[in-house]
């Protein structure tokens, strides 16, 4: 009985969306813009054209600055405060590999 009660009251991680880096062999994030709620988690996955990184402007705690070299490699980012979060792949920002996540 105690075990089932613990399962019921365990906090869950709120999943929101996936972002693909280098999707389809292009220097893009897909999607490059999305809207989520506070507490939601975004999974960022390296696509077909590595290496890439994921750097959130003014938020090093949300960033993954190390380059991901393996296709399919992924990590989760949880957004705990409302705001607009601009992100980019540092090596490919000049090619337009940028985006924004709106958290409300």
Where are the regions a protein language model picked out?
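Extracytoplasmic copper-binding redox domains, predominantly the cupredoxin/blue-copper superfamily
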Residues: 4, 8-104
């Amino acid at each position: 009985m105690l075990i089932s009660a613990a399962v019921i009251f365990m906090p869950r991680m709120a999943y929101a969306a996936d972002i693909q880096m280098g999707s389809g062999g292009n220097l893009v994030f897909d999607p490059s813009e999305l809207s989520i709620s506070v507490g939601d988690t975004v999974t960022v996955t390296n696509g077909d054209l590595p290496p890439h990184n994921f750097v959130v402007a003014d938020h090093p705690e949300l960033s993954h600055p190390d380059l991901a070299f393996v296709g399919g490699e992924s990590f989760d980012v949880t957004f705990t405060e409302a705001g607009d979060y601009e992100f980019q792949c540092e090596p490919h920002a000049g090619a337009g590999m940028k985006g924004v996540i709106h958290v409300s």
